[in-house]
Curated annotation (Swiss-Prot):
Main location: cytoplasm
Source taxon at top rank: Bacteria
Role description: Associates with the EF-Tu.GDP complex and induces the exchange of GDP to GTP. It remains bound to the aminoacyl-tRNA.EF-Tu.GTP complex up to the GTP hydrolysis stage on the ribosome.
A Gene Ontology molecular function term of the record: translation elongation factor activity
Protein name: Elongation factor Ts
Key words of the record: Cytoplasm, Elongation factor, Protein biosynthesis
Length: 276
């Protein structure tokens, strides 16, 4: 049996992020050859990937970057445990994946997974890294936001974890500070749409039926129902439409007013939260 040094075990663990016991066994099987031991560990991990296929991925991170063409790309990369999520290997993996997807201009999961990452596709690269880390890793979402400018905000819900919430805003105008504060507002308020006109008609009609039934059950006069319903629909739009919302920093102002005062126009946004 080859004499396996502590230095070799340490070097391979630092390179791959594998456990002490698995690393030592692989080196012993490879007769101390670091390259062969790496292949053994990757093969073992690849076999484990199939077994992990049905596992849930409720942890992970959100990452985003501004591109040279006036767009920004954002991804949610998921894993099984917060232990892996906060590790340097997983964060480095997300950086490589994000760079590859942004360079390819991918806008869908299918395009993103097929994007080149060195000599591999993103899907192959993630699979290899999952094999090493010993967890299921999943590219869950990707978004590309366009604008004259873009503002990016990444929020940590815990100092020990990478960003769990990410927002990208496409906008026109010169007030970068207000643009960033709008991104922060979106991370907190979680609007689903930009304007009330963007809310699907079936969603509005469903809400209209609900508030109508609630108003009737409260004994409101039939003659007053139309006005009451419109008022309650207004409250609904404040929840789901960004421009209708009260500004998180000053609830006397709506986002629409803040944008007007700062000379900004928002063209679109995306918000990701890990596991949501």
């Amino acid at each position: 049996m080859a004499n396996i040094s502590i230095a070799d075990i340490k070097a391979l663990r630092e390179q791959l992020g594998t456990g002490m016991v698995d690393t030592k066994k692989a080196l012993e099987e490879a007769g101390g050859d670091l390259e062969k031991a790496t292949e053994i560990l990757r093969l073992k991990g690849a076999k484990g990937n199939a077994k992990r296929a049905d596992r849930s991925t409720s942890e992970g991170l959100v990452a985003a970057k501004e591109n040279a063409n006036g767009t920004a790309t954002m991804i949610e990369l998921a894993c099984e445990t917060d232990f892996v999520a906060k590790g340097e290997k997983f964060v480095a993996l997300s950086d490589t994946v994000l760079d590859a997807i942004a360079a390819a201009g991918s806008t869908t999961i299918e395009e993103a997974l097929a994007a080149p990452a060195g000599s591999q596709t993103v899907a192959e690269f993630i699979g290899d890294e999952a094999a090493i880390l010993g967890e299921k890793i999943e590219l869950r979402r990707v978004a590309v936001v366009n604008g004259e400018h873009v503002a990016i905000y990444l929020h940590k819900t815990s100092k020990d974890l990478p960003p769990q919430v990410g927002v990208v805003v496409g906008y026109a105008g010169d007030d970068t500070e207000t643009a960033r504060s709008i991104a922060q507002h979106i991370s907190f308020a979680n609007p689903a749409h930009l304007t009330r006109e963007d809310v699907p008609a079936e969603e509005v009609e469903s809400e209209r039926r609900i508030v109508k039934e609630i108003s009737r059950s409260e004994g409101k006069p039939e003659a007053a129902l139309p006005k009451i319903i419109e008022g309650r629909l207004g409250a609904f739009f404040k929840q789901v439409a960004l421009l209708e919302q009260e500004y998180a920093r000053d609830n006397k102002l709506t986002i629409s007013q803040v944008l007007k005062d700062s000379g900004l126009t928002v063209s679109g946004f995306a918000r990701f939260k890990v596991g949501a």
